[in-house]
Amino acid sequence: IKIRLSKINKEICLGINIGPNKDTAPDNIINDYLFCYKELHEYADFVTLNISSPNTPNLRKLHNIESFTKIIKAILIERDLHATKPKILIKLSPDEEVSSYRNIINTINQTDIDGVIISNTTNDEILKEQLNVGHLPGGISGKSLRNSSNKILKEIKSIISNEKIIVAVGGVFDVDSYNEKFELGADLVQMYTGLIYEGPNLVKRIIENDKQISRNSWVSIKS
């Protein structure tokens, strides 16, 4: 990965998503984050600390404020040791209690963490049964994620510092769902499942058809 990253045109904005291996013991999870950060940070404009992948057993337990605080403290200390200092964002689950989000955001507001990404895929059991995918591993993405992701986006916008960056993701397939994220408080928007089904032309269509887009108002996340 390092070799490929070293060949990328750095005029583009590059984000790197890091997390622990599936078989990493709980006591060593911080070491996985630190290893990935040390190896890759110099190539990134922002590094995402993924504490919410549904495919890594028990990863979402890192929303516990004690565990969360230990991880971000270790990463922030590591960032200060290097000349290259990418922004650090936390990718959150859409399935936590409101109290958990409040604890996490209050902690972020008091640290040099740069922002959050809302949200990862959902493991909502009722939704999985409705979609007849309850027997399958992993989380639900795409249009079915839109409502739950937007609900958390609205909640977090109400409590996060204005200095922090909010990146919204989940259910963006057209101009309306794209603009909806900004109306709820996002600074930037990411797309995943929409690109799989619609292809890269989705981005072009959104930009061409969205009369509200102003380049002067965009938030930069480049280092």
Predicted feature descriptions by range:
Residues 19-23, 52-54, 91-95, 119-123, ...:
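Active-site beta-loop-alpha junctions enriched in small/polar residues
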Residues 1, 14-18, 47-50, 88-92, ...:
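Hydrophobic faces of well-ordered beta-strands that scaffold small-molecule active sites
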Residues 54-63, 105-162, 198, 202-203:
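Glycine/Thr-rich beta-alpha phosphate-binding loop at enzyme active sites
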